[in-house]
Structure formats: C-alpha cells, structure tokens
C-alpha cells in the first residue's frame, strides 16, 4: 500500500504553568485531529492517571463511622470527609505501594494534615488542610492507610484493605490527581488544526507531567492494536519545519485568509492573489494600496501573526533576497 503521509506536530508551547495548572499549545495537526487528540487526552487525564489516597482509617475507641468522640469537635463522618481532601505525593513508583500514617495528639489542639507523622518519601501537598479540633486533655490516636490507585474507588471496594479488622473503616478514595481539563481547537492556515489544552491538578504532579503520562497511556494502548497486523499500512509522519510551514502558507490564496471585505477588495484590485505575492511588497507599498488604510494594514499584520507567520521578519528576509537578485541581474 502506498505510504500515507500525516503532519506530525513539531511545536508544543507551554504557557502559564504553575504548581497546579498549565496551558499547552500543540501544532500543527491534520484537519480534525485537534478534536481527536484533545478529546482522547482529556478522557485519559480525568479518568486514568494514577494517584495516592487514603483507603481506610482507624480511630482509637471508634468502631464505626456513625458516631461522635468525646472531646473532639467534629463527628467521625466529618473527620473522614476532611481526610478525603488531603493530597499526597509519594516517591515510590511501585503499584503495590502501601503505607500507614499515624496521628497522635493531645488537646487542646487544632489538627491539620501536617499533624500526621510522615515517613520518608511521602509528602502532603496541602499541609494546612483542616481535620478536627481537640478540647482539653483529650488524647487522639488515628491511623490511616495510603494506597495507590486510579480514578475513583468506593468504600465497598476498599474494604479489602481493612483486613476485616474491628474499627477499621473503609472510605471512598479519589486517586486521580487531575482536577479539570479543557481544550479548544482553532483552524489555521493550510487547513491545519491548533490544539490548546489547559490542565489543573491537585498539586501532586505538574500539569506537563500529567499530559506526558496521559499521552504515554494512549500510546501503550495503541501499540497493542498496531501489533494485531504484521503488515500494517505504513503511515509516515512528516514533521514540518518552520521553513516548510512558511512555504505552505505562501502557496495559499488570499481568499483563504478570512479577511475583511475592504481589505480583500483592496488586495484584489492591486492584483494580489496569493500570500506569496503579498509578502513581496514592502510595508510602505502595502499601506499605499488603494482603499487600504492603517487599520486594514494592522488587520493584515495580525492575521499573519495569528497563523504563526512572523510577517515583519519574513518580509525583511524576502526583500533582502529580492534586492540581491536585482543586483545580480544588473
């Protein structure tokens, strides 16, 4: 079968990243691939990334969650709800990771996530997160079990980790470290897509780490499908260089630029039908075109920048070569 050539993204721009969020621009993509790639990444980011969470809790003197503890401000159910919101990050990459954390305190005291005794390799991202408050002379001893997992796991499924011990309360666990994902697709020159994806995490990992992990998960799944056939149709991915991207833009007709009627008519009356013909003009020559004012000229410059073509820099380069060619002719 004849080789099929697809454009492969050569540019991924990371903007506005902080410890809990990041925005990424991926381009160029074949027409329609912005939605295809964006939707696949979003689904995996929200459902399939591994994380660490509390799976059960044991509080000294407590046998079940529907009770109160003398000298403790919150009831057991509220304490459990507060525990679910603690964000953990661990260095251990093994799937069977398990760690027990203890919190031993005496009142009066306000307990937060930082009140836990942490072993090496375990970090709490939100140490100021509130758990409960103890009154005078109250002793409080709590043990929680940390496990790794994916997505959401209900308390019923977490009971296996409690080993049927009396007083061990299984709780719901939200393992996924990604809080929100949104994306948008813009159409660019050359009938290409530009994908912008924004990721917010709980702080357990950076947005770029989440994006890379999601992409890796997708690749691993697709590789299994590729292996179904020993002789798949060969698909060649072509990574366009910036020079090639410029060349593809230069071949476009001005009708494809989605210009205002006034600007379009001005260029047409001047006999300018393609982007290649347009960039051969100097800025002064463009401004002097009939019925084309500075507002239209600014629109033209903005349009070039919008589609990733540095109009001024490229124009100077073209003019320089044109001058050199004229000198050679004379």
Swiss-Prot record:
CDD domains: RNAP_alpha_NTD. It is an enzyme of class 2 (transferase). It comes from Onion yellows phytoplasma (strain OY-M). The keyword Coiled coil does not apply. This is DNA-directed RNA polymerase subunit alpha. GO terms for cellular component: cytoplasm; DNA-directed RNA polymerase complex. Keywords: DNA-directed RNA polymerase, Nucleotidyltransferase, Transcription, Transferase. The N-terminal domain is essential for RNAP assembly and basal transcription, whereas the C-terminal domain is involved in interaction with transcriptional regulators and with upstream promoter elements. Disulfide bonds: none annotated. It holds the Pfam family RNA_pol_A_bac. It catalyses: RNA(n) + a ribonucleoside 5'-triphosphate = RNA(n+1) + diphosphate. The gene is rpoA. Belongs to the RNA polymerase alpha chain family. NCBIfam families: PRK05182.2-5 (NF003519), rpoA (TIGR02027). DNA-dependent RNA polymerase catalyzes the transcription of DNA into RNA using the four ribonucleoside triphosphates as substrates. Residues 245-330 are annotated as: Alpha C-terminal domain (alpha-CTD). HAMAP family: RNApol_bact_RpoA. GO terms for biological process: DNA-templated transcription. The keyword Nucleotidyltransferase applies. GO terms for molecular function: DNA binding; DNA-directed RNA polymerase activity; protein dimerization activity. Its EC number is 2.7.7.6. Residues 1-229 are annotated as: Alpha N-terminal domain (alpha-NTD). Homodimer. The RNAP catalytic core consists of 2 alpha, 1 beta, 1 beta' and 1 omega subunit. When a sigma factor is associated with the core the holoenzyme is formed, which can initiate transcription.
């Amino acid at each position: 079968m004849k080789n099929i050539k697809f454009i492969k993204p050569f540019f991924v721009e990371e903007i506005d990243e902080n410890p809990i969020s990041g925005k990424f621009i991926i381009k160029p993509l074949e027409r329609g691939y912005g939605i295809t790639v964006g939707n696949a990444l979003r689904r995996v980011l929200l459902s399939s990334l591994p994380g660490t969470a509390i799976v059960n809790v044991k509080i000294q003197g407590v046998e079940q969650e529907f009770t109160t503890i003398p000298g403790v401000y919150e009831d057991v159910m509220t304490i459990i709800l507060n525990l679910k919101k603690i964000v953990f990050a661990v260095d251990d990459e093994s799937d069977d990771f398990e760690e027990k954390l203890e919190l031993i305190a005496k009142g009066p005291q306000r307990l937060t996530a930082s009140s836990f005794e942490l072993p090496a390799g375990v970090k709490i991202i939100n140490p100021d997160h509130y758990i409960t408050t103890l009154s005078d002379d109250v002793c409080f001893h709590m043990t929680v079990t940390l496990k790794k997992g994916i997505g959401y796991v209900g308390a019923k499924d977490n009971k296996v980790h409690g080993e049927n011990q009396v007083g061990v309360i299984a709780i719901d666990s939200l393992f996924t470290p990604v809080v929100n994902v949104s994306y948008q697709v813009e159409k660019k020159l050359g009938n290409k897509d530009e994908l912008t994806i924004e990721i917010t995490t709980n702080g357990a990992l950076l947005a770029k780490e989440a994006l890379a992990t999601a992409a890796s998960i997708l690749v691993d799944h697709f590789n299994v499908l590729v292996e179904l056939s020993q002789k798949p149709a060969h698909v060649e991915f072509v990574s366009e260089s910036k020079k090639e991207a410029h060349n593809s833009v230069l071949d476009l007709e001005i009708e494809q630029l989605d210009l205002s009627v006034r600007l379009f008519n001005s260029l047409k009356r001047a006999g300018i039908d393609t982007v290649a013909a347009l960039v051969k003009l100097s800025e002064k020559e463009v401004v002097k075109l009939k019925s084309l004012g500075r507002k239209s000229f600014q629109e033209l410059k903005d349009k070039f920048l919008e589609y990733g073509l540095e109009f001024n820099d490229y124009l100077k380069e073209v003019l320089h070569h044109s001058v050199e060619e004229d000198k050679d002719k004379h």
